[in-house]
A protein has these predicted regions:
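Transmembrane alpha-helix/helix-exit interface in multi-pass inner-membrane proteins
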Residues: 170-172, 252-269
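Active/binding-pocket-proximal capping segment
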Residues: 264-277, 321-326
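Conserved, well-structured beta-alpha core segment at the onset of a catalytic domain
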Residues: 84-88, 104-107
Length: 359
């Protein structure tokens, strides 16, 4: 980039730079769709195939593990990755990117992505809090991000909120209810449909209790032999943990750590909420984040693109990321701003101009 061009970009407002980024994203999307016309022609079918293929893959891995064909670690890793595809599908469905003229098919796909990720709120409720997130990202009434620790100072409480849904409900729930009560009251979707999440949590905490008990016996040098009546329960919990509980927890923990830290929460200098697309997110594509990205489909490196253009399927966002990332950097979106994580995700500005430095 020439010095003159860099100077012109620096002189742009956030709105102007955001508009440039949107143009580049849409340009890259058009190039892909023109080169591969099937992407547009079969977009609905692609979404359905990914949904059913991912769910079917999780079932297949479970069967292979139960049949003692694949080890536990392989089942956990592959199922966790497949569950991350289902999360991306839910996200696309929230923005009606597939079967927008068929509520029946959309609802069927919503059911699939929910049943195979039972530790989440139902997708109809999440749709409303996610669309709210796009309107108020970086504000105190951003229910979706604050619930997973965005804006919290680093410490034990934040770690617990990122990793444990019950801790999130206990620690963040009262604050969010206070700060976003009008928005929560406007939500029409039912919060509870079937007790899927509660059932998941019952199984999950039972497994954790069993594991801690076994660990305690091991540390004490005592052989852990469950009574005969408990043995089938232990076997069931261990199997459920490998095929469903741990993969779902891994996926959820990974995306909550990444998402809560790639979104900014307020402007540290002006103590104001963020209303600029350029300042809402950063790009996390450091190798340090790779283990987490394995279970959240490279979320930190590409989700910022979605904030600029919401009507792009996740696989096209990934496909076009190498092209679009250059525009994000050029127009001032920050990269790997780990310093913000030590400042409760506050957006730090440089000097009086308040323009982002490009890392």
């Amino acid at each position: 980039m020439t010095a003159a061009k860099a100077k012109r970009i620096t002189a742009m407002s956030d709105k102007e730079r955001g508009s440039k980024i949107i143009q580049w994203i849409r340009f890259g999307d058009r190039l892909l769709r023109r080169r591969h016309t099937w992407l547009t022609r079969f977009q609905d079918q692609i979404g359905l195939a990914i949904t059913l293929g991912s769910a079917g893959g999780m079932i297949a891995m479970s069967a292979l593990y139960i049949a003692d064909i694949v080890p536990a670690w392989a089942c956990i890793v592959v199922s966790g990755i497949l569950a991350s595809f289902l999360h991306e599908m839910e996200h696309d469905l929230i923005h009606s990117l597939y079967y927008k003229n068929s509520a029946q098919v959309q609802n069927f796909m919503f059911w699939v992505v929910w049943l195979f990720r039972g530790n989440t709120v139902n997708p109809w409720f999440r749709k409303e809090i996610h669309l709210l997130h796009h309107r108020v990202s970086g504000h105190k009434n951003d229910v979706e991000e604050r619930y997973i620790s965005n804006g919290m100072p680093w410490g034990l409480k934040r770690i617990l909120v990122m990793l444990d849904p019950l801790a999130a409900l206990t620690i963040q729930g009262p604050k969010i209810k206070r700060d976003a009560l009008p928005e929560l009251r406007r939500i029409k979707a039912p919060h509870k449909i079937i007790p899927l999440q509660r059932t998941f949590m019952l199984l999950w905490y039972s497994f954790l209790l069993l594991s801690l008990t076994r660990l305690g016996f091991l540390v004490a040098g005592i052989d852990f032999t469950p009574p005969a009546w408990l043995a089938p329960v232990v076997t069931f919990l261990n199997t459920a943990a490998v095929v469903y509980l741990i993969p779902c927890w891994l996926r959820q923990a990974a995306i909550q750590i990444v998402s809560s830290n790639m979104h900014y929460y307020g402007d540290a200098v002006n103590a104001q909420p963020i209303d600029s697309l350029v300042r809402q997110t950063q790009v996390l594509n450091s190798w340090l984040v790779l283990p987490l990205h394995l279970f959240c489909f490279n979320f930190g490196a590409t989700h910022g693109i979605h904030h600029f253009v919401v009507n792009q399927p996740f696989y096209l966002r990934q496909w076009g990321a190498p092209f679009v990332t250059k525009a994000l950097r050029r127009y001032g979106v920050r990269f790997n701003d780990f310093a913000s994580m030590r400042q409760a995700n506050a957006y730090q500005t440089n000097g009086e101009t308040g323009l982002a430095s490009v890392h």
